[in-house]
Amino acid sequence: MPAHAYLCAMDAHAPLIDPFARPITYLRVSVTDRCDFRCTYCMAEHMQFLPKRDLLTLEELDRLCSAFVGLGVRKLRVTGGEPLVRRNIMEFFRAMSRHLGAGLDELTLTTNGSQLARFATELADCGVRRVNVSLDTLDEDRFARITRWGRLPQVLQGIEAAKAAGMRVKINTVALKGFNEDELFRLVGWCADQGHDLTFIEVMPMGEMGEEERLDQYWALSDLRDRLGERFTLTPLAERTGGPARYVRLDETGQKIGFITPLTHNFCESCNRVRITCTGELFMCLGQEDRADLRAPLRAGAEDAPLRAAIRDAIARKPKGHDFDYSRRHVAGQVSRYMSHTGG
């Protein structure tokens, strides 16, 4: 092979590095905007979903994610909507499992848990070792109210099934003022008893919720952490898992608690991730509107070179950080799209 051709071939598969020298090694891909819940902070109750023809096929998702793995992505998280309501979704997990140990270190998903009892064993067979479950309350009535359509017992059964299949479960809880403040210690205690990690998340300024309503629900995690510190000894952990969370250990229980605080602590300096929507849009930052269309080069032909070039061009536009800010009564940087479309 001529030297210039060799260099071009090498460059085609060089790792993705953004303008701020951050390697891009973590891809979150939304496989559907549909969900069997209607969580109030995530989507409208009578949601207008995208036409199915606009969604990437499972084969296109395979090709797109495989291109990212070839460019150095080592962690792939499948999201939605609710990923497990996508028809034949296990075909996609089986396809992605071939990359484990061959470039991909971890295949995982974020789910509301409603379909976990059905799919836990298959997911484990595909190499999924960890699963994040969104759970904001252990009160059945509150759960029905916040999810509108969800049933708490179904989710708890799914969590048990995941645990029985050998997967480690992490609970993601959105901190909502006036909703689950009084359940803080109940959630911590339950996770300790069950052996689950727990991460608290600040409500983000996305979707249709009005500014005043979102501000009324906003519970700064600095306050939540102070409340935990009144009952437990919190030891900061240096551990980083490739995500935005910062962790502490509760010395009395030994459990790990995470805090995702995009609004009061900018976690952008170490950002290593990008997001693909179910329609093939690449968002370089959750808190910015800039995006790149990857569906067009994906459908232009079987050759992956234009697709890789489009990915590189997009990564070259990745910003230094987001614009979320709740320090003022105005929600600076509010983003109009739904998390169910971008991928939660």
UniProtKB/Swiss-Prot annotation:
BP term (GO), one: Mo-molybdopterin cofactor biosynthetic process
Annotated function: Catalyzes the cyclization of GTP to (8S)-3',8-cyclo-7,8-dihydroguanosine 5'-triphosphate.
Protein name: GTP 3',8-cyclase
GO molecular function, one term: cyclic pyranopterin monophosphate synthase activity
Native source organism of the sequence: Paracoccus denitrificans (strain Pd 1222)
4Fe-4S among keywords: yes
Residues that hold [4Fe-4S] cluster 1 according to the record: C35, C39, C42
Residue numbers binding GTP: R28, R77, T110, K170, R273, V274, R275
CDD domains assigned: Radical_SAM, Twitch_MoaA
Keywords: 4Fe-4S, GTP-binding, Iron, Iron-sulfur, Lyase, Metal-binding, Molybdenum cofactor biosynthesis, Nucleotide-binding, S-adenosyl-L-methionine
EC number: 4.1.99.22
Involved pathway(s): Cofactor biosynthesis; molybdopterin biosynthesis
Family designation: Belongs to the radical SAM superfamily. MoaA family.
Enzymatic reactions: GTP + AH2 + S-adenosyl-L-methionine = (8S)-3',8-cyclo-7,8-dihydroguanosine 5'-triphosphate + 5'-deoxyadenosine + L-methionine + A + H(+)
Cofactor note: Binds 2 [4Fe-4S] clusters. Binds 1 [4Fe-4S] cluster coordinated with 3 cysteines and an exchangeable S-adenosyl-L-methionine and 1 [4Fe-4S] cluster coordinated with 3 cysteines and the GTP-derived substrate.
Domain spans labelled Radical SAM core: 19-244
Record-linked Gene3D superfamilies: Aldolase class I (3.20.20.70)
Binding site for [4Fe-4S] cluster 2: C268, C271, C285
Binding site for S-adenosyl-L-methionine: Y41, G81, S134, M204
NCBIfam families membership: moaA
Quaternary assembly: Monomer and homodimer.
UniProt cofactor(s): [4Fe-4S] cluster
